[in-house]
Amino acid sequence: VATPYTTAEVFELDYFQSADVMTLVHPSHEPRELTRTANDAWTLEKIVFQPKQAFPTNVSVSPNTTGSENASYVVTAVNRDNAEESLRGTGSSFAISAITKANPCVVTATGHGVSNGDEIHISDVGGMTELNGDRFKARAITTNTITLTDTAGNDINSTNFTTYTSGGNVLIAYDEIANGNATADNTITWNAASGAESYTIYKEKNGIYGFIGRTEETTFTDDNIDPDLSDTPPKTRNPFKSTNNFPSTGGFFQQRRLFGNTNENRQRLFFSQTANFTNHAVSSPTKDDDAITATIAALQVNEVRHFVPLSDLLVLTSGGEWQVTGVDDRITPSTIQVKPQSYYGATTLKPIVAGDIAIFMCHGQHVRDLGYKFETDAYAGNDISILARHLFDFNTVVDWDFASAPFSSLW
Protein backbone atom coordinates (compact mmCIF):
# COMPACT_ATOMS: atom_id res chain seq x y z
CA VAL A 1 0.00 0.00 0.00
CA ALA A 2 1.51 3.32 -1.07
CA THR A 3 1.59 6.04 1.60
CA PRO A 4 2.45 9.76 1.57
CA TYR A 5 4.52 9.53 4.77
CA THR A 6 8.31 9.79 4.82
CA THR A 7 10.56 7.76 7.11
CA ALA A 8 11.16 10.86 9.24
CA GLU A 9 7.40 11.27 9.75
CA VAL A 10 6.68 7.76 11.02
CA PHE A 11 7.12 8.54 14.73
CA GLU A 12 4.90 11.64 14.36
CA LEU A 13 1.99 9.51 13.14
CA ASP A 14 -0.93 8.89 15.48
CA TYR A 15 -3.40 6.07 14.93
CA PHE A 16 -6.62 4.74 16.43
CA GLN A 17 -8.85 1.90 15.32
CA SER A 18 -12.50 0.91 14.99
CA ALA A 19 -13.07 -2.66 13.72
CA ASP A 20 -11.17 -3.06 10.41
CA VAL A 21 -10.61 0.66 9.91
CA MET A 22 -7.59 2.46 11.35
CA THR A 23 -7.47 6.26 11.27
CA LEU A 24 -4.04 7.80 10.65
CA VAL A 25 -3.22 11.45 11.38
CA HIS A 26 -0.14 13.61 10.87
CA PRO A 27 0.11 17.42 11.02
CA SER A 28 1.49 17.61 7.47
CA HIS A 29 -1.08 15.35 5.81
CA GLU A 30 -4.84 15.08 5.47
CA PRO A 31 -6.35 12.41 7.77
CA ARG A 32 -6.58 8.98 6.18
CA GLU A 33 -8.25 5.62 6.79
CA LEU A 34 -6.40 2.33 6.44
CA THR A 35 -9.10 -0.25 5.70
CA ARG A 36 -8.87 -4.04 5.60
CA THR A 37 -11.58 -5.65 3.47
CA ALA A 38 -9.84 -9.06 3.34
CA ASN A 39 -6.62 -10.58 4.66
CA ASP A 40 -4.85 -9.55 1.47
CA ALA A 41 -6.90 -6.45 0.58
CA TRP A 42 -5.95 -3.12 2.14
CA THR A 43 -6.63 0.46 1.08
CA LEU A 44 -5.35 3.82 2.34
CA GLU A 45 -7.61 6.74 1.45
CA LYS A 46 -8.14 10.35 2.48
CA ILE A 47 -11.18 10.82 4.70
CA VAL A 48 -14.06 12.65 3.01
CA PHE A 49 -15.60 14.77 5.76
CA GLN A 50 -19.20 14.71 4.57
CA PRO A 51 -22.34 12.80 5.51
CA LYS A 52 -22.31 9.31 4.02
CA GLN A 53 -26.05 9.52 3.35
CA ALA A 54 -26.62 10.54 -0.30
CA PHE A 55 -28.50 13.80 -0.85
CA PRO A 56 -31.66 14.30 -2.97
CA THR A 57 -31.16 15.56 -6.51
CA ASN A 58 -33.26 17.46 -9.05
CA VAL A 59 -35.15 19.34 -6.33
CA SER A 60 -37.82 21.45 -8.01
CA VAL A 61 -40.79 23.54 -6.94
CA SER A 62 -44.01 24.24 -8.81
CA PRO A 63 -46.90 26.50 -7.72
CA ASN A 64 -50.39 25.08 -7.55
CA THR A 65 -51.69 28.65 -7.58
CA THR A 66 -49.68 31.45 -9.16
CA GLY A 67 -48.88 34.65 -7.33
CA SER A 68 -46.10 37.15 -6.73
CA GLU A 69 -44.32 35.68 -3.70
CA ASN A 70 -40.86 34.09 -3.64
CA ALA A 71 -40.44 30.79 -1.81
CA SER A 72 -37.16 28.93 -1.30
CA TYR A 73 -36.83 25.34 -0.06
CA VAL A 74 -34.12 22.92 1.10
CA VAL A 75 -34.62 19.13 1.09
CA THR A 76 -32.39 16.64 2.93
CA ALA A 77 -32.43 12.83 3.13
CA VAL A 78 -32.46 10.91 6.45
CA ASN A 79 -30.66 7.56 6.59
CA ARG A 80 -32.79 4.53 7.44
CA ASP A 81 -30.17 2.91 9.71
CA ASN A 82 -28.62 5.70 11.80
CA ALA A 83 -30.83 8.76 11.06
CA GLU A 84 -27.88 10.67 9.59
CA GLU A 85 -29.06 13.73 7.66
CA SER A 86 -27.57 14.33 4.23
CA LEU A 87 -26.14 17.43 2.64
CA ARG A 88 -28.74 19.78 1.21
CA GLY A 89 -30.38 18.44 -1.94
CA THR A 90 -29.42 20.07 -5.21
CA GLY A 91 -31.74 21.76 -7.68
CA SER A 92 -30.76 23.86 -10.70
CA SER A 93 -27.63 22.75 -12.60
CA PHE A 94 -25.32 24.83 -14.79
CA ALA A 95 -22.53 23.61 -17.07
CA ILE A 96 -18.93 24.60 -16.26
CA SER A 97 -16.73 25.80 -19.14
CA ALA A 98 -13.56 26.89 -17.29
CA ILE A 99 -11.86 26.83 -13.87
CA THR A 100 -8.78 28.85 -12.95
CA LYS A 101 -5.67 27.58 -11.15
CA ALA A 102 -5.45 30.55 -8.81
CA ASN A 103 -6.05 31.90 -5.34
CA PRO A 104 -8.99 32.35 -5.21
CA CYS A 105 -10.36 29.75 -7.60
CA VAL A 106 -12.88 31.10 -10.14
CA VAL A 107 -15.40 28.91 -11.99
CA THR A 108 -17.01 29.95 -15.28
CA ALA A 109 -20.59 28.72 -15.83
CA THR A 110 -22.55 30.84 -18.27
CA GLY A 111 -25.84 32.19 -16.85
CA HIS A 112 -25.35 30.24 -13.63
CA GLY A 113 -28.05 31.96 -11.54
CA VAL A 114 -26.00 31.67 -8.34
CA SER A 115 -26.09 34.48 -5.75
CA ASN A 116 -23.47 35.59 -3.23
CA GLY A 117 -23.47 33.29 -0.20
CA ASP A 118 -25.25 30.41 -1.94
CA GLU A 119 -24.15 26.87 -1.10
CA ILE A 120 -23.18 25.02 -4.27
CA HIS A 121 -22.09 21.52 -5.22
CA ILE A 122 -19.58 20.75 -7.99
CA SER A 123 -19.52 17.45 -9.87
CA ASP A 124 -18.23 15.70 -13.01
CA VAL A 125 -15.25 18.04 -13.56
CA GLY A 126 -12.55 16.73 -15.87
CA GLY A 127 -8.94 17.36 -14.89
CA MET A 128 -9.41 19.40 -11.70
CA THR A 129 -11.08 16.50 -9.91
CA GLU A 130 -10.10 17.95 -6.51
CA LEU A 131 -13.35 19.96 -6.67
CA ASN A 132 -15.66 17.04 -7.43
CA GLY A 133 -18.21 16.05 -4.80
CA ASP A 134 -17.46 18.96 -2.51
CA ARG A 135 -19.56 21.81 -1.13
CA PHE A 136 -18.61 25.48 -1.48
CA LYS A 137 -20.00 28.95 -0.93
CA ALA A 138 -20.14 31.46 -3.74
CA ARG A 139 -18.83 35.03 -3.59
CA ALA A 140 -17.80 37.83 -5.99
CA ILE A 141 -20.50 36.74 -8.41
CA THR A 142 -20.64 37.99 -12.00
CA THR A 143 -23.12 36.93 -14.66
CA ASN A 144 -20.94 34.02 -15.76
CA THR A 145 -18.34 33.46 -13.00
CA ILE A 146 -18.29 32.26 -9.39
CA THR A 147 -15.46 32.70 -6.89
CA LEU A 148 -15.23 29.67 -4.60
CA THR A 149 -14.86 29.66 -0.82
CA ASP A 150 -15.19 26.80 1.60
CA THR A 151 -18.30 26.63 3.75
CA ALA A 152 -16.56 28.74 6.41
CA GLY A 153 -15.93 31.54 3.88
CA ASN A 154 -12.21 30.95 3.23
CA ASP A 155 -11.07 31.32 -0.39
CA ILE A 156 -10.27 28.10 -2.25
CA ASN A 157 -6.68 28.05 -3.51
CA SER A 158 -6.52 25.90 -6.65
CA THR A 159 -2.96 26.88 -7.61
CA ASN A 160 -1.65 23.35 -7.03
CA PHE A 161 -4.74 21.52 -8.30
CA THR A 162 -4.76 19.52 -11.52
CA THR A 163 -5.42 21.63 -14.63
CA TYR A 164 -9.07 21.78 -15.67
CA THR A 165 -9.77 19.99 -18.97
CA SER A 166 -13.50 19.83 -19.61
CA GLY A 167 -17.02 19.29 -18.32
CA GLY A 168 -18.47 19.69 -14.86
CA ASN A 169 -21.61 21.12 -13.32
CA VAL A 170 -22.48 23.67 -10.66
CA LEU A 171 -25.58 22.66 -8.68
CA ILE A 172 -27.39 25.01 -6.30
CA ALA A 173 -28.18 23.48 -2.89
CA TYR A 174 -31.78 24.74 -2.69
CA ASP A 175 -34.63 25.47 -5.07
CA GLU A 176 -36.59 28.69 -5.35
CA ILE A 177 -39.86 29.58 -7.01
CA ALA A 178 -40.47 33.20 -7.95
CA ASN A 179 -44.25 33.14 -8.54
CA GLY A 180 -45.63 31.24 -5.59
CA ASN A 181 -48.71 32.45 -3.77
CA ALA A 182 -48.19 33.20 -0.07
CA THR A 183 -51.69 32.03 0.81
CA ALA A 184 -51.80 29.02 -1.52
CA ASP A 185 -49.63 25.93 -1.89
CA ASN A 186 -46.43 24.90 -3.66
CA THR A 187 -45.36 21.33 -4.45
CA ILE A 188 -41.73 20.30 -4.00
CA THR A 189 -40.43 17.19 -5.77
CA TRP A 190 -37.03 15.47 -5.94
CA ASN A 191 -35.28 12.29 -6.96
CA ALA A 192 -34.93 9.58 -4.31
CA ALA A 193 -31.60 9.25 -2.48
CA SER A 194 -30.09 5.80 -1.95
CA GLY A 195 -30.31 4.61 1.65
CA ALA A 196 -32.88 7.20 2.70
CA GLU A 197 -35.84 6.34 4.89
CA SER A 198 -37.40 9.80 4.82
CA TYR A 199 -36.86 13.37 3.67
CA THR A 200 -36.92 16.62 5.65
CA ILE A 201 -38.17 19.83 4.05
CA TYR A 202 -37.17 23.33 5.14
CA LYS A 203 -38.49 26.71 3.97
CA GLU A 204 -36.72 30.06 4.02
CA LYS A 205 -37.97 32.90 6.20
CA ASN A 206 -35.98 36.11 6.74
CA GLY A 207 -32.86 34.46 5.34
CA ILE A 208 -33.08 31.35 7.56
CA TYR A 209 -34.38 27.92 6.57
CA GLY A 210 -36.75 26.30 9.07
CA PHE A 211 -38.46 22.91 9.29
CA ILE A 212 -41.89 22.55 7.66
CA GLY A 213 -42.31 18.79 7.34
CA ARG A 214 -41.03 15.27 6.80
CA THR A 215 -42.15 12.60 4.35
CA GLU A 216 -41.20 9.16 3.09
CA GLU A 217 -42.32 10.10 -0.41
CA THR A 218 -40.45 12.15 -3.03
CA THR A 219 -43.00 14.93 -3.07
CA PHE A 220 -44.28 17.38 -0.47
CA THR A 221 -46.96 20.08 -0.59
CA ASP A 222 -46.39 23.29 1.34
CA ASP A 223 -49.84 24.69 2.06
CA ASN A 224 -48.53 27.91 3.61
CA ILE A 225 -46.76 26.17 6.51
CA ASP A 226 -44.90 28.55 8.81
CA PRO A 227 -41.28 27.34 9.16
CA ASP A 228 -39.93 26.35 12.57
CA LEU A 229 -36.68 28.34 12.77
CA SER A 230 -35.56 26.42 15.86
CA ASP A 231 -34.95 23.40 13.59
CA THR A 232 -32.65 24.27 10.69
CA PRO A 233 -30.83 22.14 8.08
CA PRO A 234 -27.26 21.06 8.90
CA LYS A 235 -24.38 23.17 7.63
CA THR A 236 -21.61 21.01 6.25
CA ARG A 237 -18.08 21.64 7.54
CA ASN A 238 -14.62 20.22 6.95
CA PRO A 239 -12.35 21.62 9.68
CA PHE A 240 -9.33 19.92 8.07
CA LYS A 241 -9.64 21.27 4.55
CA SER A 242 -6.41 23.25 4.22
CA THR A 243 -2.71 23.05 5.06
CA ASN A 244 -1.98 23.94 8.71
CA ASN A 245 -5.40 22.52 9.64
CA PHE A 246 -4.52 18.81 9.64
CA PRO A 247 -4.91 17.14 13.09
CA SER A 248 -2.02 15.56 14.98
CA THR A 249 -3.92 13.20 17.27
CA GLY A 250 -7.32 11.56 17.66
CA GLY A 251 -9.48 8.86 19.20
CA PHE A 252 -13.07 7.70 19.81
CA PHE A 253 -15.49 8.45 22.64
CA GLN A 254 -19.29 8.25 23.04
CA GLN A 255 -19.71 7.23 19.37
CA ARG A 256 -17.82 10.29 18.16
CA ARG A 257 -14.49 10.38 16.31
CA LEU A 258 -12.17 12.91 17.91
CA PHE A 259 -9.32 14.98 16.49
CA GLY A 260 -7.03 17.56 18.04
CA ASN A 261 -4.04 19.86 17.61
CA THR A 262 -3.62 21.39 14.17
CA ASN A 263 -0.68 23.65 13.32
CA GLU A 264 -3.08 26.59 13.31
CA ASN A 265 -5.04 25.61 16.44
CA ARG A 266 -2.81 23.69 18.84
CA GLN A 267 -5.33 23.73 21.69
CA ARG A 268 -8.46 22.82 19.76
CA LEU A 269 -10.63 19.70 20.02
CA PHE A 270 -12.85 18.47 17.17
CA PHE A 271 -15.68 15.97 17.74
CA SER A 272 -17.68 14.40 14.89
CA GLN A 273 -21.43 14.03 15.01
CA THR A 274 -22.69 11.18 17.19
CA ALA A 275 -22.40 7.84 15.33
CA ASN A 276 -21.40 9.61 12.10
CA PHE A 277 -17.61 9.63 12.07
CA THR A 278 -17.12 11.55 8.80
CA ASN A 279 -19.77 14.17 9.55
CA HIS A 280 -18.77 17.50 11.15
CA ALA A 281 -21.97 19.35 10.26
CA VAL A 282 -23.68 21.72 12.69
CA SER A 283 -27.10 23.34 12.94
CA SER A 284 -28.27 26.67 14.31
CA PRO A 285 -29.49 26.43 17.03
CA THR A 286 -27.30 23.45 17.85
CA LYS A 287 -28.63 19.91 18.26
CA ASP A 288 -27.31 17.39 20.78
CA ASP A 289 -25.78 15.14 18.11
CA ASP A 290 -24.09 18.00 16.21
CA ALA A 291 -20.33 18.11 15.75
CA ILE A 292 -18.42 19.92 18.50
CA THR A 293 -15.43 22.26 18.47
CA ALA A 294 -13.82 23.31 21.76
CA THR A 295 -10.60 25.00 22.87
CA ILE A 296 -8.51 24.27 25.96
CA ALA A 297 -7.32 27.64 27.26
CA ALA A 298 -5.77 28.00 30.72
CA LEU A 299 -2.52 29.35 32.20
CA GLN A 300 -0.30 28.44 29.24
CA VAL A 301 -0.29 26.89 25.79
CA ASN A 302 -1.94 23.47 26.02
CA GLU A 303 -1.01 21.66 22.83
CA VAL A 304 -3.31 18.64 22.57
CA ARG A 305 -1.19 15.48 22.62
CA HIS A 306 -3.50 12.53 23.34
CA PHE A 307 -7.11 11.41 23.90
CA VAL A 308 -7.53 8.68 26.53
CA PRO A 309 -11.01 7.07 26.82
CA LEU A 310 -11.61 5.79 30.35
CA SER A 311 -14.92 6.13 32.22
CA ASP A 312 -14.52 9.78 31.22
CA LEU A 313 -12.62 11.25 28.31
CA LEU A 314 -9.15 12.43 29.33
CA VAL A 315 -7.15 14.83 27.18
CA LEU A 316 -3.40 14.98 27.76
CA THR A 317 -1.76 18.22 26.65
CA SER A 318 1.74 19.67 26.75
CA GLY A 319 0.77 21.58 29.89
CA GLY A 320 -1.62 19.38 31.82
CA GLU A 321 -4.23 16.65 32.10
CA TRP A 322 -7.91 17.42 31.45
CA GLN A 323 -11.26 15.72 31.99
CA VAL A 324 -13.93 16.27 29.32
CA THR A 325 -17.52 15.77 30.50
CA GLY A 326 -21.06 16.96 29.90
CA VAL A 327 -24.37 17.12 31.73
CA ASP A 328 -25.58 13.64 32.83
CA ASP A 329 -22.37 12.20 31.32
CA ARG A 330 -23.45 13.19 27.79
CA ILE A 331 -21.07 15.41 25.84
CA THR A 332 -23.03 17.75 23.56
CA PRO A 333 -22.28 21.13 21.94
CA SER A 334 -24.15 22.97 24.70
CA THR A 335 -22.95 20.94 27.70
CA ILE A 336 -19.27 20.17 27.04
CA GLN A 337 -16.99 20.95 29.99
CA VAL A 338 -13.19 20.73 30.05
CA LYS A 339 -11.74 20.59 33.59
CA PRO A 340 -8.05 20.51 34.60
CA GLN A 341 -6.98 17.54 36.76
CA SER A 342 -3.24 18.24 37.10
CA TYR A 343 -0.47 20.21 35.44
CA TYR A 344 2.36 17.79 34.66
CA GLY A 345 2.09 17.78 30.87
CA ALA A 346 2.57 14.87 28.46
CA THR A 347 5.18 14.21 25.79
CA THR A 348 4.21 12.98 22.33
CA LEU A 349 4.81 9.33 23.31
CA LYS A 350 1.46 7.53 22.99
CA PRO A 351 0.04 6.70 26.47
CA ILE A 352 -0.76 3.17 27.64
CA VAL A 353 -4.16 2.15 29.05
CA ALA A 354 -3.70 -0.56 31.69
CA GLY A 355 -6.94 -1.70 33.28
CA ASP A 356 -8.68 1.42 34.53
CA ILE A 357 -5.67 3.76 34.52
CA ALA A 358 -3.63 5.63 31.94
CA ILE A 359 0.18 5.57 31.96
CA PHE A 360 1.93 8.44 30.22
CA MET A 361 5.35 9.99 29.82
CA CYS A 362 5.57 13.50 31.21
CA HIS A 363 8.30 16.08 30.85
CA GLY A 364 11.72 15.14 32.18
CA GLN A 365 11.20 11.47 31.23
CA HIS A 366 9.04 10.76 34.26
CA VAL A 367 6.43 8.02 33.92
CA ARG A 368 3.13 8.80 35.64
CA ASP A 369 -0.15 6.95 36.05
CA LEU A 370 -3.55 8.65 36.03
CA GLY A 371 -6.79 7.21 37.36
CA TYR A 372 -10.04 8.20 39.03
CA LYS A 373 -9.91 8.86 42.78
CA PHE A 374 -13.25 8.50 44.56
CA GLU A 375 -12.18 10.52 47.57
CA THR A 376 -11.48 13.63 45.47
CA ASP A 377 -13.89 12.92 42.59
CA ALA A 378 -11.06 13.70 40.18
CA TYR A 379 -8.25 12.03 38.24
CA ALA A 380 -4.82 11.86 39.87
CA GLY A 381 -1.75 9.63 39.93
CA ASN A 382 1.85 9.09 40.92
CA ASP A 383 5.33 9.14 39.47
CA ILE A 384 5.82 5.39 38.97
CA SER A 385 9.38 5.76 37.67
CA ILE A 386 10.70 7.09 40.99
CA LEU A 387 12.10 3.68 42.06
CA ALA A 388 13.93 3.15 38.78
CA ARG A 389 15.25 6.57 37.86
CA HIS A 390 18.48 5.03 36.52
CA LEU A 391 16.48 3.65 33.57
CA PHE A 392 15.30 7.09 32.53
CA ASP A 393 17.97 9.61 33.51
CA PHE A 394 19.75 10.92 30.42
CA ASN A 395 17.69 8.57 28.23
CA THR A 396 14.72 9.20 25.96
CA VAL A 397 11.91 6.67 25.57
CA VAL A 398 10.84 6.62 21.91
CA ASP A 399 8.31 3.77 22.09
CA TRP A 400 6.82 1.33 24.57
CA ASP A 401 4.17 -1.37 25.01
CA PHE A 402 2.29 -3.14 27.78
CA ALA A 403 1.68 -6.82 28.52
CA SER A 404 -1.15 -7.56 30.97
CA ALA A 405 -0.31 -11.28 31.35
CA PRO A 406 1.29 -13.32 32.77
CA PHE A 407 2.71 -10.29 34.63
CA SER A 408 1.70 -6.68 34.22
CA SER A 409 4.79 -5.39 32.48
CA LEU A 410 5.58 -2.16 30.70
CA TRP A 411 8.23 -2.63 28.04
Spans of features found by a protein language model:
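Trp- and S/T/G-rich repeat-edge/linker motifs of beta-rich repeat architectures
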Residues: 1-8, 37-57, 172-178, 214, ...
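Small/polar beta-strand repeat architecture
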Residues: 1-13, 26-27, 91-244
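N-terminal assembly/attachment segments of tailed bacteriophage virion structural proteins
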Residues: 1-23, 82-85, 111, 115-125, ...
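Beta-sheet-dominated scaffold domains
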Residues: 10-15, 250, 256, 264, ...
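Short, surface-exposed terminal/edge motifs of secreted or surface/virion proteins that either
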Residues: 26-48, 144-153, 208-218, 265-272, ...
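Pro/Thr/Ser/Gly-rich low-complexity, intrinsically disordered linker/stalk tracts
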Residues: 48-70, 79-93, 171-195
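Short, intrinsically disordered, charge-balanced linker/junction segments flanking boundaries
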Residues: 87-90, 165-168, 406-411
